[in-house]
Swiss-Prot record:
Pfam families: Apolipoprotein. SUPFAM superfamilies: Apolipoprotein A-I. It is found in: Secreted; Secreted, Extracellular space; Secreted, Extracellular space, Extracellular matrix; Extracellular vesicle. The gene is APOE. Residues 271-283 are annotated as: Specificity for association with VLDL. This is Apolipoprotein E.
């Protein structure tokens, strides 16, 4: 495959055979240059186109490849790759189309299928021409093949022009299809926006209507709560004053009772003193008399003893 692509590059640089009209080939080559940087299916079609240009050179290497089945296999692989990329791109566009009108989607899909079928038929025709040329070339081995080359070259040139025309038609239809998708998406977005706008405005109105009573209720509830807190504070202050007064009353009563108890104790002490004081005085007097008697007795006793001894 690398050898084929190297030969392709050399062929593109060298140009076509002398029996091919140069000016139309240059124009077609310029037309196909833009396909190299497009969508994946366009790039695949460009590779098919370049392979066809290489086959059209009818060089000795190409004749050897055509006598084998490799050229047909390569061409078949490029055809399948191109049609696969076309189907993939078409499926992506259909997926992007979304909820577009079914009638429009069916019509556009039908047009794309027709253009896709024409492109596939053109590539199939190219492959059949190459198979026919290989059969005729094998039958004419050793004979002059100039007439066969000229006929194949003419057919391939016409097929390339038709292939370019059908490819451009498919490209235009896909572009229209994609533009329709964008317009449909924009219309859907605008329609959705128009439908949602009244709902958004209504929601804003309802929110404002709901928020006002809620705010009023919150303010009323806050006022009631403040009133209750103030009432509780006032009641607590009054209760504290009552408790303070009760404490003062209890303190006064306790002090009064303490004074009464002190007075009673003093009175009782006075009564006890009045009771026992005469007794104490009498006992003290008797005790003094007893002491005096003892002293007198003790004082007279030594005097009598001393007189007896003398």
């Amino acid at each position: 495959m690398k050898v084929l692509w190297a030969a392709l590059v050399v062929t593109l640089l060298a140009g076509c055979q002398a029996d091919v009209e140069p000016e139309p080939e240059v124009q077609l080559g310029n037309e196909w240059a833009k396909w190299q940087a497009g969508q994946p299916w366009e790039q695949a079609l460009g590779r098919f186109w370049n392979y066809l240009r290489w086959v059209q050179t009818l060089s000795d290497q190409v004749q050897e490849e055509l006598l084998s089945t490799q050229a047909t296999q390569e061409l078949t692989a490029l055809m399948e790759e191109t049609m696969k990329e076309v189907k993939t791109y078409k499926a992506q566009l259909e997926q992007q189309l979304g909820p577009t009108a079914q009638e429009t989607q069916a019509r556009v899909s039908k047009e794309l299928q027709a253009a896709q079928a024409r492109l596939g038929a053109d590539m199939e025709d190219v492959r059949n021409r190459l198979v026919q040329y290989r059969s005729e070339l094998q039958a004419m081995m050793g004979q002059s093949t100039e007439e066969l080359r000229g006929r194949l070259n003419s057919h391939l040139r016409k097929l390339r022009k038709r292939l370019l025309r059908d490819a451009e038609d498919l490209q235009k239809r896909l572009a229209v299809y994609q533009a329709g998708i964008r317009e449909g998406a924009e219309r859907s977005v605008n329609t959705l926006r128009e439908r949602l706008r009244p709902l958004v405005e209504q929601a804003a109105t309802v929110r404002s209507l709901i928020s006002k009573p809620l705010q009023e209720r919150a303010e009323a509830w806050g006022q009631r709560l403040r009133g209750r807190l103030e009432k509780v504070g006032t009641q607590a202050g009054d209760r504290l004053d009552e408790v303070r007064e009760q404490v003062q009353e209890v303190r006064a009563k306790v002090e009064e009772q303490a004074n009464q108890m002190r007075l009673q104790a003093e009175a009782f002490h006075a009564r006890l003193k009045s009771w026992f004081e005469p007794l104490v005085q009498d006992m003290q007097q008797k005790w003094a008399e007893l002491v005096e008697k003892v002293q007198l007795a003790v004082g007279t006793s030594p005097t009598s003893e001393s007189s007896e001894k003398q």
